[in-house]
Amino acid sequence: MAELTISSDEIRSAIEKYVSSYSPEVSREEVGVVTDTGDGIAHVEGLPSVMTEELLEFPGGIYGVAMNLEAQEVGAVILGESDKIEEGQEVRRTGKVLSVPVGDDFLGRVVNPLGEPIDGLGEITAEENRALELQAATVVQRQGVSEPMQTGIKAIDSMTPIGRGQRQLLIGDRKTGKTTVAVDTIINQKGNWESGDPQKQVRCIYVAIGQKGSTIAGVKRSLEEAGALEYTTIVAAPASDSPGLKWLAPYAGSAIGQHWMYQGKHVLIVFDDLTKQAEAYRAISLLLRRPPGREAYPGDVFYLHSRLLERCAKLSDEMGAGSMTGLPIIETKANDVSAYIPTNVISITDGQCFLQSDLFNSGQRPAIDVGISVSRVGGSAQINAIRKVTGSLKIDLAQFRELEAFSAFASDLDATSKAQLDRGARLMEVLKQGQGEPLPVEEEVVSLFLGTKGHLDSVPVEDVRRFESEFLAHMRRTHDTVLKDIVETKKLSDDGAKTIADTAEEFKKQFTTSSGESAAPSEPEAEALAADEVGQETVKVNRPAPKK
């Protein structure tokens, strides 16, 4: 048997070699423990270094957001199925703030507030991830609003115009057509999208907060049928979602829009509606035991909406001249616009369109109350042609409303007042539009020209809308060059106005009203006097009495 020899030098060199090549790896991980959970909220003990609004990882791939940082525990909002979170489970820090994937592949898709597709059409390839809480553009990074955002709705484009980069509030009671106005505005961007011009194209985002699933499906179907879904992203947080997801949905939508805005593109974003976001945030704050304020809302509910809506802007040329236009929606109760959340959002936005339930129920749709609706951008967001034909429209309608209320009590009116009432009734008919029927800007100009210049005065009120649609079709057939000139120059020339006026007078001669008569104004006929009514004028002269 061979003798076993041990070399101490070899053993020493082997140990030295191992020690010299050894690099100790130290890992440090903060782990917290769930102390209690319920209603989409979890309290976590531990995590001393956690940051505010940091993403926390719960078991089962569920995430939460750290909201309350207290001495002994952290209050977190759970983003997902909170019933799977149990007391005693471990919670880990991620070291990241909440972000969503963004990119052009989101067009035509329906996603949740975390950017995950929920339409069953497969995964979405993201260009990058964008944090939800980002600073809005500063004052020097912005420029004034000067480009019109055509809605295709005559009542808005004529009296409360919206510009690219503006925040225009849609406010009113439930079931007054707020969502319809917003969806029609999205549909109206189809012509710009099909033009292929990046300066005209508008990418649209519809954020549904706390809506019924059937309502969201109806909006998606309307956009699909109109061919508008290909340039629209739907961010859905339905009523069945947790308060945390409803709270985050608007920020997710604006992050997707900001990605395009900073690339120099134009974006339209609809928040439907911010009342439900405020209610979800109120629920979160009360569950986290934050002190309540007016109407039980937390003290920072104004900041909740202001930091969201300030992200809508028209960027300066140095920043790429992109824009993001916001259409926030607020639901009122009993037409009360002086409540807490409505007054907050009114003070943040650049104007509001108030939709009144009384007008809606009377058949005036869209039910926009011109009296308290306003756009603080004004004429700078209108093309010259619309500004020319609607100069005094808002004042005329306000006077019509006042006179209409007065005429309900007056037994006799003078001819001027009657003419004003007749003109006002026809203007109100011109401003009516059906759902899903936005008009191109050149047809808006022609319709408003007919109403404001008195060319509909001889048309019966019940026939105004039929006359309008048939006349627009007639203009397309016979004077398409006038309409194309309005689109190209954005102006209504004197020759164009004369052509429209002359064509309207000719068209009225061939238009038949519902009573079977011609719409052309009839010449007043002089009535012949009867023989016994004809009398000789007599002159009586009083002579002074002769002097005596």
Swiss-Prot record:
PANTHER family: ATP SYNTHASE SUBUNIT ALPHA, MITOCHONDRIAL (PTHR48082:SF2). It comes from Saccharopolyspora erythraea (strain ATCC 11635 / DSM 40517 / JCM 4748 / NBRC 13426 / NCIMB 8594 / NRRL 2338). Its EC number is 7.1.2.2. The keyword Ion transport applies. This is ATP synthase subunit alpha. It is found in: Cell membrane. It comes from the Bacteria. Its main location: membrane. GO terms for cellular component: plasma membrane; proton-transporting ATP synthase complex. ATP binds at residues 172-179. Keywords: ATP synthesis, ATP-binding, Cell membrane, CF(1), Hydrogen ion transport, Ion transport, Membrane, Nucleotide-binding, Translocase, Transport. Residues 510-548 are annotated as: Disordered. The gene is atpA. Produces ATP from ADP in the presence of a proton gradient across the membrane. The alpha chain is a regulatory subunit. It is a peripheral membrane protein. Belongs to the ATPase alpha/beta chains family. Residues 514-531 have a biased composition (Low complexity). It is an enzyme of class 7 (translocase). InterPro entries: ATP_synth_asu-like_sf, ATP_synth_asu_C, ATP_synth_asu_C_sf, ATP_synth_F1_a_nt-bd_dom, ATP_synth_F1_asu, ATPase_a/bsu_AS, ATPase_F1/V1/A1_a/bsu_N, ATPase_F1/V1/A1_a/bsu_N_sf. The record marks 373 as: Required for activity. Pfam families: ATP-synt_ab, ATP-synt_ab_C, ATP-synt_ab_N. Gene3D superfamilies: 2.40.30.20, ATP synthase alpha/beta chain, C-terminal domain, P-loop containing nucleotide triphosphate hydrolases. It catalyses: ATP + H2O + 4 H(+)(in) = ADP + phosphate + 5 H(+)(out). One of its GO terms (molecular function) is proton-transporting ATP synthase activity, rotational mechanism. F-type ATPases have 2 components, CF(1) - the catalytic core - and CF(0) - the membrane proton channel. CF(1) has five subunits: alpha(3), beta(3), gamma(1), delta(1), epsilon(1). CF(0) has three main subunits: a(1), b(2) and c(9-12). The alpha and beta chains form an alternating ring which encloses part of the gamma chain. CF(1) is attached to CF(0) by a central stalk formed by the gamma and epsilon chains, while a peripheral stalk is formed by the delta and b chains.
